[in-house]
Structures are given as structure tokens and as C-alpha cells.
Amino acid sequence: MLLAHISDTHFRSQNHKLYGFIDVNAGNADVVSQLNGLRERPDAVVVSGDIVNCGRPEEYQVARQVLGALRYPLLLIPGNHDDKACFLEYLRPLCPQLGSDPQNMRYAIDDFATRLLFIDSSLAGHAKGWLTDNTVAWLEAQLSDAGDKPTAVFMHHPPLPLGNAQMDPIACENGHRLLALVERFPSLVRIFCGHNHNLTMTQYRQATIATLPATVHQVPYCHEDTRPYYDMSPPSCLMHRQVGEQWVSYQHSLAHYAGPWLYDEHISCPTDERRSPC
């Protein structure tokens, strides 16, 4: 299994920029082009929420056009910037697993050695996250049915504070209910989130929990400063690879850079250079 995982695309309407100066639509189109050009082709691309910025139909039209150019299956979940009804109307053609109920978007992918569960943690009208009773019950049933099969959950909001002064107040408010399932089910070993616009990792019992960078603009990690900073540090995504029982996640840069070059030991330490005595 190989998954490319991006997050927080924050598409805007045609010819509109984020915050008046960030061309997220062009940036995301470039990300799609880079993913389509990967030398090792993923089985699917995950987008973990905040697909658009303002929840408007015009934004979803752009998102569907740009994301629809990906040459891989899409696995989508909404975030707090998304409008549930518009999200489903415009993006279900790209991800049929979303179903038909905007209030109950969740699904399981059982095609790989690890089971993948996708849930909606968004709460309409709020930046913070919330897990509904139906979502928690569904997760419990899925984990019970899967037995010992390793399971990864994908959601938008992290289920616990991560020491980020700006983002912790708008994490998943009742994420403890998911952590309780981690305690009950040893098979729940990974939780991947968006929302925080930076790569942050922690461990809870047997579960590795991570938030992803965004595709365009980032939020710096500050432990004490609560002011709402953002910046244009280089974007990246995560690649999730599983071979046998081993799952490896690694960061893949989405910035433009020189290379790659093949390593050549003959030019690393050229033989014609005189080595000075120590």
C-alpha cells in the first residue's frame, strides 16, 4: 500500500485569493501536478479536510475541477471550513464512499493490510471538532468487527491537545471518546489529522497520532503565543507505505527544488584532492 496524504487545501472561488494575496488555487493545482508526476504511484490520495475556505459552492466547483485532475482514487473527509451539504454535493463524484447523508459522512476502506476508517469531526458553525454519538458508535462497531486487523483513523481535528497554543483550543473537544477506543482496541494504531497546518506527532498508548502540513500556507507551532500567525513556509505532504506488517510514514516536499542526483562516491571525496594530515 502507498497513500499520498495532503490536507487543508482551502480552495477559493475562481480568481479569488486567500487573505487577499495567497493564490491557493494555483498552489493546489501545482500540488496535483506534482502528485501526478510521482515516480512511485500511490494507490490513492487522502485529503483530510478543509477542502475549501468559506464553504461556498463556487469554491467547491474549483476544488472539484482541480482535484478531479488527480490520476488516483481520492479519499476525502470534511473539515471545519467545509459546508457539509456542499461538500457532499460537489465532491461525492470524486469520492463515492462519502455516501448520501451530509450529516453522517464516514466510511471504511478494507483493501489493504491495515484497515482505513474515515470520519467527519467537523461541527457546523464552529472551528473546534466534535465526534457525534453516531460516529463513535460506528467506530466502535468497525473496530469490533475488524478483530486484530491493524486500523488507522483519518479525521480533520486532532483528538487531543498537542501543546500548540493557537490550535489546541480548536482541537476535537470530545476527542477523549476516540482515545477511549484506543485504550479498548489494541488494533487502533494510527490516527492522522489535518487542521493544524504543520507536521506534529505524538503517541497515545499504542496509537501514533499526527497532524499534517497544509498544501499552501502553514501555521507555525508556538507553545505559548496564542496569536493567529500563518506563514508561507514550504508545503509538504505525508506518504504512507505499508509492506507486510510494517507501516512507514515519511514527509514528501511539495516545494520546488533542484535534483535529484545520483550519489557518486568519486566526486564526494575526489582522489586528486590532497588530504591534510590530522
Curated annotation (Swiss-Prot):
Cofactor requirements of the protein: Fe(2+)
Cofactor note: Binds 2 Fe(2+) ions per subunit.
A Pfam family the protein falls into: Metallophos
Function: Catalyzes the hydrolysis of the 3'-5' phosphodiester bond of glycerophosphodiesters such as glycerophosphorylethanolamine (GPE), a typical phospholipid metabolite.
Residue numbers binding Fe cation 1: 8, 10, 50, 197
Family assignment from sequence similarity: Belongs to the cyclic nucleotide phosphodiesterase class-III family.
Gene Ontology BP terms: glycerol metabolic process
Gene3D superfamilies according to UniProt: GpdQ, beta-strand dimerisation domain, GpdQ, catalytic alpha/beta sandwich domain
Taxonomic lineage from the root: Bacteria, Pseudomonadati, Pseudomonadota, Gammaproteobacteria, Enterobacterales
Organism domain of life: Bacteria
Protein name: Glycerophosphodiester phosphodiesterase GpdQ
Molecular-function GO term, any one: glycerophosphodiester phosphodiesterase activity
